[in-house]
Amino acid sequence: MSPKDYLAIVHCIAGLKERTRHAWMTSGRQESVAEHSWRMALMAYFLRDEFPTVDLTRVLLMALLHDMGEVFTGDIPTFEKTDADRAREHELRDEWIDALPAPYAAEVRSLFAEMDAMETEEAKIVKALDRMEAVITHNEGDPHTWLPLEYDLQRTYGVKEAAFTPVLKELRAEVNREVDEVIAGLNKETEL
């Protein structure tokens, strides 16, 4: 790959740092798509002993790349995203993949096909962590930024995706305990 082609990729993926997500960080600013993907990758890494038979490299690459389409569309919260939004994001993502140098295009296309099919343990882990990371970030941020529909969403988002394995099911249950603590804290504020 030429330095020019390499830098074109690097400049494009920089957009993940610029695109903000719906969640607010503890510092009072919105999380970026890059931060979300980065933490997902680390979450996967620290679960490696729980999943000794999975291809960790594929999981890490999926985690880092899974929201690449949002470079072009921005992040649309799950409760607002339509089928048309998803189709447009996939179309733009696929155009980006097609422009990658051949060996990378094939590998990245394969990763997205695997994630879209949701048949492998690797893809299921990534989907569960994607949902779980969003809930954890909401728990860590200011709950006063939550929309009314998010109180229920915090308890249910990603529960189904985590249920395929006891490890992630148990982890998601612990995340729900944190959700309950955050909501209980808000309820105490209202009582004062």
Describe each PLM feature range.
Residues 1-192:
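Alpha-helical, largely C-terminal catalytic domains
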